[in-house]
């Protein structure tokens, strides 16, 4: 008698898990990853604030776009990935032997890995950006605030 309801419940649970819906067991991992992301963003911000390198000072003139939304959903981290790719292009990190730019590249690689892990299989989201732009330090401050908001909603 309850077999159909049980099967429906199992099917719904599998559909939610397959589509990346957070489960109670994944919340702890998500919190750790968001905390790591937050730490890497803060470390990257400290390196970017260092103006002793010509490439870094060039980066401070580049304009970045922020997403239109004020939500704290993990799917919006895709927008961070898109803008980090542009930051990497601006810095032209590949041939650089400078210690600061190598460290920035390492932090960015770590950020990308964490964001991809947090996103899971969700790839259908399209970022919508504000028309106004921000400079590099403000860009990173806003993403740090975004990650702090996500972390506080998970705790």
From Swiss-Prot:
Annotated keywords: Adaptive immunity, Cytokine, Disulfide bond, Glycoprotein, Growth factor, Immunity, Secreted, Signal
SMART domains (alphabetical): IL2
Disulfide bonds: 79-127
UniProt GO MF annotations: cytokine activity; growth factor activity; interleukin-2 receptor binding
Glycosylation sites: 23
Signal peptide location: 1-20
Keyword Disulfide bond: yes
GO cellular component term of the entry, any: extracellular space
Alphabetized Pfam families for the sequence: IL2
Subcellular location: Secreted
GO biological processes: adaptive immune response
SUPFAM superfamilies with a match to the protein in the record: 4-helical cytokines (SSF47266)
Domain of life: Eukaryota
Function noted in UniProt: Cytokine produced by activated CD4-positive helper T-cells and to a lesser extend activated CD8-positive T-cells and natural killer (NK) cells that plays pivotal roles in the immune response and tolerance. Binds to a receptor complex composed of either the high-affinity trimeric IL-2R (IL2RA/CD25, IL2RB/CD122 and IL2RG/CD132) or the low-affinity dimeric IL-2R (IL2RB and IL2RG). Interaction with the receptor leads to oligomerization and conformation changes in the IL-2R subunits resulting in downstream signaling starting with phosphorylation of JAK1 and JAK3.
Similarity annotation: Belongs to the IL-2 family.
Protein name (record): Interleukin-2
Organism in which the protein naturally occurs: Capra hircus
């Amino acid at each position: 008698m309850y077999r159909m309801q049980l099967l429906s419940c199992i099917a719904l649970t599998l559909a939610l898990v397959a589509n990346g819906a957070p489960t109670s067991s994944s919340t702890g991992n998500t919190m750790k990853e968001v905390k790591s992301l937050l730490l890497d963003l803060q470390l990257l911000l400290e390196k970017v604030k260092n103006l002793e390198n010509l490439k870094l000072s060039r980066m401070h003139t580049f304009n970045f776009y922020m997403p239109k939304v004020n939500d704290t959903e993990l799917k919006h981290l895709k927008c961070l990935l898109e803008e980090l790719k542009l930051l990497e292009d601006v810095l032209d990190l590949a041939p650089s032997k400078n210690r600061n730019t190598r460290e920035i590249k390492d932090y960015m690689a770590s950020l990308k890995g964490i964001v991809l892990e947090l996103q899971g299989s969700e790839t259908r989201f399209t970022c919508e950006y504000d028309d106004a732009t921000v400079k590099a330090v403000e860009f990173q401050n806003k993403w740090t605030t975004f990650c702090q908001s996500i972390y506080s909603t998970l705790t």
